[in-house]
C-alpha cells in the first residue's frame, strides 16, 4: 500500500510579492527549499493563514538568502503580499519506507529566515503563540 504523507512544511512564511503576470508557481528562497527538501517543480500546497485560501501549485527556486516567497500567476488573486502562509509538500511512501519517514518542518521569522527545524508536524515552538493540537490548554 502507498500512503501520501507530509514531507515538507514551511510554517508561517510571509508572502513578499504577488504578481498576476508571472508564470504561475510559488517562488521560494533557495535556503528554505533546501531546508524543507522541496525541489524546483515539485507540487506544493499553499495555505493562507490570513484568509483561509488553499491552492496547489509548484515550487520555483528563488534567490538564496533573499527571504522571497512569491505568489505568481492567477494565485496572486487569492494570496497577497504580507499574508502568512504555510507551504506544504507531500511524498508518496510505501509501508516499508514509513519506518524511516521523518517530515521536515521549518519555522521562519518575519523575514522568512529559518529559526527552527523539526520533524513533528504538530509541534508549536515555545514563545510562538501557536498551540500544539495534541496538548490541550494547561497541560
UniProtKB/Swiss-Prot annotation:
State the GO CC annotations. Answer: cytosol
Pyruvic acid (Ser) found at:
25
Just give the chief location class: cytoplasm
Keyword terms, alphabetized: Autocatalytic cleavage, Cytoplasm, Decarboxylase, Lyase, Pantothenate biosynthesis, Pyruvate, Schiff base, Zymogen
**How many and how are cofactors bound here?**
Binds 1 pyruvoyl group covalently per subunit.
Q: Which cofactor(s) are needed, names only?
A: pyruvate
Q: Name one Pfam family in it.
A: Asp_decarbox
Q: Where is this region: Disordered?
A: 116-139
Entry annotation: catalytic residues: 25, 58
The UniProt catalytic activity note for this protein reads: L-aspartate + H(+) = beta-alanine + CO2
Record-listed E.C. numbers? 4.1.1.11
**This protein's pathway:** Cofactor biosynthesis; (R)-pantothenate biosynthesis; beta-alanine from L-aspartate: step 1/1
Q: How is it modified after translation?
A: Is synthesized initially as an inactive proenzyme, which is activated by self-cleavage at a specific serine bond to produce a beta-subunit with a hydroxyl group at its C-terminus and an alpha-subunit with a pyruvoyl group at its N-terminus.
Functionally, this protein is described as follows: Catalyzes the pyruvoyl-dependent decarboxylation of aspartate to produce beta-alanine.
Q: Which family does it belong to?
A: Belongs to the PanD family.
Assembly description: Heterooctamer of four alpha and four beta subunits.
Q: Which PANTHER family match?
A: ASPARTATE 1-DECARBOXYLASE
Q: What is this protein called?
A: Aspartate 1-decarboxylase
Q: Which organism is it from?
A: Corynebacterium urealyticum (strain ATCC 43042 / DSM 7109)
Q: Which gene encodes it?
A: panD
Amino acid at each position: 500500500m502507498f500512503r501520501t504523507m507530509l514531507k515538507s512544511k514551511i510554517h508561517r512564511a510571509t508572502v513578499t510579492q504577488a504578481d498576476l503576470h508571472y508564470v504561475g508557481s510559488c517562488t521560494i528562497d533557495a535556503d528554505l527549499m533546501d531546508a524543507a527538501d522541496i525541489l524546483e517543480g515539485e507540487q506544493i500546497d499553499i495555505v493562507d493563514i490570513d484568509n483561509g485560501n488553499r491552492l496547489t501549485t509548484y515550487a520555483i527556486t528563488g534567490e538564496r538568502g533573499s527571504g522571497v516567497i512569491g505568489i505568481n500567476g492567477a494565485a496572486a488573486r487569492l494570496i497577497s503580499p504580507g499574508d502568512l502562509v504555510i507551504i506544504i509538500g507531500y511524498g508518496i511512501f510505501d509501508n516499508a519506507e514509513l519506518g524511516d519517514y521523518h517530515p521536515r518542518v521549518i519555522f521562519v521569522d518575519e523575514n522568512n529566515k529559518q529559526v527552527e527545524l523539526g520533524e513533528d508536524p504538530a509541534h508549536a515552538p515555545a514563545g510562538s503563540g501557536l498551540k500544539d493540537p495534541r496538548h490541550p490548554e494547561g497541560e
